[in-house]
Amino acid sequence: MKKFLIALVKAYQRWISPLFPLSCRFCPTCSVYMIQAIEKHGLKGVLMGIARILRCHPLSETGDDPVPDYFSLKRKKTPLDN
């Protein structure tokens, strides 16, 4: 299941994402975050990725937002964000 979900995200990265201007406000990008979250947390990683996409808008903060080691739908604050 993980491989299938990751393949879907990679298909998006290859075929759909290039059609739009760069707009992700975080590092790693939302699609890379989704892949990392799925690899680390399985199906719960999909929920984490969706929550991340919902946080990625012009009014949100920017910066480093790595996948946490534990399941969470909130942004992981890093020392550089303070």
Swiss-Prot record:
Cross-referenced InterPro entries: Membr_insert_effic_factor_YidD (IPR002696)
Broad class of the protein's primary localization: membrane
Keyword vocabulary terms for this entry: Cell membrane, Membrane
Record-level GO cellular component terms: plasma membrane
UniProt subcellular location: Cell membrane
Membrane topology category: Peripheral membrane protein
Top-level taxon in the UniProt lineage: Bacteria
Family to which this protein belongs: Belongs to the UPF0161 family.
NCBIfam families: membrane protein insertion efficiency factor YidD
Annotated function: Could be involved in insertion of integral membrane proteins into the membrane.
Protein's UniProt name: Putative membrane protein insertion efficiency factor
Organism: Streptococcus thermophilus (strain ATCC BAA-491 / LMD-9)
